[in-house]
UniProtKB/Swiss-Prot annotation:
Protein name per its UniProtKB record: Small t antigen
Domain of life assignment: Viruses
Zinc finger (C4-type): 101-114
Zinc finger (H1C3-type): 120-141
Length: 172
């Protein structure tokens, strides 16, 4: 995510979206803020045309570069389809056993917490550069990117974002 826009552009986009810079990388939150600001900045609604153009340029560039950073499309999945199939409930798909899965991933555990952590370990072994949030969706990259401790509340935030993320982008 840190390679999508340069630092100045990312800070400008977050300011235009009215979000804290710490929220950079929370794509569902950024999308909601973008749609809200489109209504506010729209010239037909009495908004600032220059801000609207600049926000559109930066957001579309960020959105396009995130798509390019992910795997090529091999089907069309929307986040609403994934969320409908799997409810946002950490004790089912996302985290099978909270205290155990949070400490060490198991190859035998089917939950996303363990599977994404194992995927992170495999990819980390094969790459020279470090993995970061959006390049990797594991909870460790999430906590490191946002500067959070690994708690049940953090798990809930991570689950919310993973639930809104298209499955193909998780690179499982």
């Amino acid at each position: 995510m840190d390679k999508v826009l340069n630092r100045e552009e990312s800070m400008e986009l977050m300011d235009l979206l009215g979000l804290e810079r710490a929220a950079w990388g929370n794509l569902p939150l950024m999308r909601k803020a973008y749609l809200r600001k489109c209504k506010e900045f729209h010239p037909d609604k009495g908004g600032d045309e220059d801000k609207m153009k600049r926000m559109n340029t930066l957001y579309k560039k960020m959105e396009q570069d995130v798509k390019v950073a992910h795997q090529p499309d091999f089907g069309t999945w929307s986040s609403s389809e994934v969320c409908a199939d799997f409810p946002l409930c950490p004790d089912t798909l996302y985290c099978k056993e909270w205290p155990i899965c949070s400490k060490k991933p198991s190859v035998h555990c089917p939950c996303m917490l363990c599977q994404l952590r194992l995927r992170h370990l495999n990819r980390k072994f094969l790459r020279k550069e470090p993995l970061v949030w959006i390049d990797c969706y594991c909870i460790d990259c999430f906590t490191q990117w946002f500067g959070l401790d690994l708690t049940e509340e953090t798990l809930q935030w991570w689950v919310q974002i993973i639930g809104e993320t298209p499955f193909r982008d998780l690179k499982l």
